[in-house]
């Protein structure tokens, strides 16, 4: 089974332009993500997908495989689908380019989750961390995931769901790492972006809004997503 890890990287970011090439301890952030990803035992091949010449030049200069994509993709997974048209694989991983501390074990866990889920007819998988901190509950940049008893996803939200009306329940934090079957990924850009995806800016909601199931697996905390210059300082 060929597992292709794709790291989407774009220059244009509202809150932090050019962040893929921002240095962390002397090395570009995208390079840190690459180094973590290639350590995953499940990954057969890794590529960086970008629409920016500056990022592509850095990759080529540092022997990181890069694929140029269109600049019109609304999400990283849409960009991934273009890569899938160019490189064939059985499983595609969307490894966020702003997760320099992503654990290889997390990547392997999501891959294994998808492989098992495909036997149940589920073609997309992701991960979550059990137990949100107080700071995460108040942070709209944090996405929360509500898991079902059967290991699938009920919903995602930037609100700290579920609301504890009757009793307290532990909230979970979504880890922005996705695994797709080839068929599911190629289908992704053909699906209309629904109102919840647009409102919450959570790309994987597109599958749920169209009635498709998503498998999920709990993983250990450890990674820090870089959305702002302050996050970069925290990672260092």
Question: What are these model-predicted stretches?
Answer:
Residues 169-236:
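Conserved alpha/beta core of the MobA/IspD/sugar-nucleotide pyrophosphorylase nucleotidyltransferase superfamily
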Residues 47, 53-112:
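Short phosphate-binding loop-to-helix
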Residues 43, 89, 119-122, 212:
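Short, high-confidence coil segments that cap the C-terminus of an alpha-helix
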């Amino acid at each position: 089974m060929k597992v292709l890890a794709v790291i989407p990287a774009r220059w244009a970011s509202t809150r932090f332009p050019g962040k893929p090439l921002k240095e962390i301890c002397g090395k570009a952030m995208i390079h840190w993500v690459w180094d973590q990803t290639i350590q995953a035992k499940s990954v057969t091949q890794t590529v960086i997908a970008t629409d920016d010449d500056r990022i592509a030049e850095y990759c080529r200069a540092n022997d990181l495989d890069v694929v140029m994509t269109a600049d019109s993709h609304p999400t990283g997974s849409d960009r991934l689908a273009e890569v899938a048209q160019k490189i064939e694989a059985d499983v595609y991983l969307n490894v966020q380019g702003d997760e320099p501390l992503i654990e290889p074990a997390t990547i392997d866990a999501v891959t294994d989750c998808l492989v098992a889920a495909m036997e149940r007819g589920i073609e997309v998988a992701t991960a979550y961390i059990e137990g949100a901190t107080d700071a995460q509950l108040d942070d709209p940049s944090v996405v929360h995931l509500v898991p079902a008893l059967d290991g699938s996803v009920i919903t995602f939200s930037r609100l700290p769901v579920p609301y504890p009306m009757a009793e307290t329940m532990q909230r979970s934090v979504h880890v922005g790492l996705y695994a797709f079957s080839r068929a599911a990924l190629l289908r992704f850009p053909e699906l209309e972006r629904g109102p919840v995806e647009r409102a919450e800016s959570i790309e994987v909601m597109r599958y749920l809004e169209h009635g498709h199931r998503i498998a999920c697996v709990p993983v250990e905390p450890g990674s820090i997503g870089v959305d702002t210059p302050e996050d970069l300082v925290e990672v260092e």
